[in-house]
Amino acid sequence: MGRQKELVSRCGEMLHIRYRLLRQALAECLGTLILVMFGCGSVAQVVLSRGTHGGFLTINLAFGFAVTLGILIAGQVSGAHLNPAVTFAMCFLAREPWIKLPIYTLAQTLGAFLGAGIVFGLYYDAIWHFADNQLFVSGPNGTAGIFATYPSGHLDMINGFFDQFIGTASLIVCVLAIVDPYNNPVPRGLEAFTVGLVVLVIGTSMGFNSGYAVNPARDFGPRLFTALAGWGSAVFTTGQHWWWVPIVSPLLGSIAGVFVYQLMIGCHLEQPPPSNEEENVKLAHVKHKEQI
């Protein structure tokens, strides 16, 4: 047992990445992979069973808990943004350096791409069997919607853009409230569960129009995977070239969410001077994070 522990310790030292930003990028990649793997996996189960193994509620529950698990996995290393819109908001508020925006976004998109690949491999036979060995983007036998979001038939581009804008703004307002230490902060350790609950609420109230992507990486990574896996360029042209809406609109919604929270709540909160005990706790926490 002693030799085994020593061997494990040595392996850990050899594999330890000293470049902190790279460690954070890897954490974002894995956290987003978990989010997409469980979230899109639930969609696959519902679609491929034609509704006999779940429904709208199970999909929303899966995405909510998937976000929670992703945050629990990556939170201590990177903050677990798992979403370029969240990273953009944090950079906009000067809580993160701007260099993290492209790096986190790339890592999150890669994680989403890999998560989609896992779901595709897991349900490979079922996907091909679903439409007699054909891959359709939309329609009664469409399977591309397992991985990325597409607008419902009733939705036009303007309404769809507004849908993603409001959904993301709501997400950012709630996230900022959850992490704000001066606004009834969530008990330490429960942030992940609370953010997962926010995603669940957004899904159950705003998911009808287009599936509430509210996350450019979660949508574009799997969409790119489907384009390469056999669905082709139709994943970008379907829905009046819908693909750009879940990228642009959430970023604009992120800015709106920041302004709404700061103008109506954040700028008006009293910030009492921290006691020595509180300051020590913060410093200890920062020191611990730096050693990861």
Swiss-Prot record:
Marked site positions, Selectivity filter: 63, 212, 218
Glycan-linked positions: 141
Intervals, Extracellular compartment: 43-56, 122-159, 207-210, 225-242
UniProt motif (NPA 2) ranges: 215-217
Topological domains, Cytoplasmic: 1-24, 75-78, 93-100, 178-189, 265-292
Keywords: Blood group antigen, Cell membrane, Glycoprotein, Membrane, Repeat, Transmembrane, Transmembrane helix, Transport
Expression induction or repression: Up-regulated by magnesium.
Chain location of the short sequence motif NPA 1 per the record: 83-85
Intramembrane residue stretches from the record: 79-92, 211-224
Quaternary structure note: Homotetramer; each monomer provides an independent glycerol/water pore. Could also exist in other oligomeric states.
Function, as annotated: Aquaglyceroporins form homotetrameric transmembrane channels, with each monomer independently mediating glycerol and water transport across the plasma membrane along their osmotic gradient. Could also be permeable to urea. Also participates in cell permeability to H2O2 and H2O2-mediated signaling. In skin, transports glycerol to the epidermis and stratum corneum, where it maintains hydration, elasticity, and supports lipid biosynthesis for barrier repair. In kidney, contributes to the reabsorption of water, helping the body maintain proper fluid balance.
Protein name in UniProt: Aquaporin-3
Name of the gene: AQP3
